[in-house]
C-alpha cells in the first residue's frame, strides 16, 4: 500500500505494475466469459487505504485486511457471486419528496422544491437521480410509490423537466396516492409479475421503510439519516444491482414494460382474453442456433423465478456445449406483436437419450405469461424430437413456492404424471 517513490511509483514503481497487471486481467475477462474480475481497487478506495489494511493481523497470521476491509470485501464478493447465479435485485421503487428531490411538493409547491445543480441541496438530489438513471439503463426496472397527489406530481415532472434526469415515462408502474406504501408496492410487483424479494425501496422516512419491510415479504427498504447520498452509498456497498454483463434485453427492459401498459389497455377494450390475444397479432421466432444470444440464454436460466421448472442454470460456456453436442439441445424464442418486440423471453434445454427427448429445464420471462408461447415452443420441441426419431418427451418440475405459476403447466400442455419424489414431479 505504500508508495516508496511517491508519485513516481504510479509511473514506474510497484503501484504502476499492479495497475498494469489488473488492466491485463480486465482485458482478459472480455475474452474469457467465465472470468470475472472483482474490482478490489475500487473497494479499497471506497473504504480508504488507511482503514483497508491491518498490519498487526498480517504480522500475526498473514491476514492483510482490517475488520472494515473484510466486511467490504465479503459484501462485494457475495454480490458478484449472487450476480453469477441471477440473484441480484430486479426493481428499485422510489418515494419522491425528499428522496429524488428536496422538499415536499404539497407544501413547498412545484417551484419550491430543490432539484438540479443550481443549489447545493438540489444538486445532491440531482446526483441521486443521475444514479437512478444509470441503474435503469443497466436493465433495472424503476417504479414510484409515493404518498402524494397524482396530478401535482405529474405537473412537477412536466414543469421541472429541465432540472431532472428522471421522468415519469421511465417508471414502469407508478402508485401515487395516500395508501400505505407497502400496499402500493405489492400492487406494483403484482402488476409487473415480480416477487417481493426482487425489490428495493428507497424513502427518506425510516418509519415508512419499517412499514414496508414489515408488511412485504422480502422487499428491502433503505432510508437516510443526514444526507440523501447515503442512499447511493448503501445501494453501492451492498451491491444489490451487481451485474457481470449487459444484454440487449437489459437495455430495452423499460421499453418492454412500457409496451405492456399499452397491452393492458387493449385487454380493457377486448370482449374476451382470447380476442385480446388475437388482436395482438403475435409472432415468435424460434432459434436453435444461439450465437448472438448466448448471454441472454444463460441469463434467463439464472434470473427467471416464476417460470423455472427445475432451477437448473447454465453458464455461457455451457450454452455453447449444448449447441455443439449432438446428444444435447437448446432452443430460445422471442415474442413480437403489434405493440412491440419483447426480445428473447424463453429458453429450454436438455438431452436426447434412448429414443427420448429430456427437458432438463425450461424458463420464461414473466413479461410474456399467458400469451400462449409455452404451447408454441412445445410444438417446436415436438417437431424437433420427431425429426430426430425420438419417441417420447420427458420433463419434470421441482415444485417450490417461487415457481407456483407453473405447478400445473405439464397438465395444461398434455403431459401425464409418471411419478413423484418429495417436490419433484416427473412427466411424459
Where in this protein do the model-derived segments appear?
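Terminal substrate-recognition subdomain of acyl/acetyltransferases
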Residues: 213, 217-280, 383-428
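Basic, amphipathic juxtamembrane/active-site segments
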Residues: 105-132, 218-224
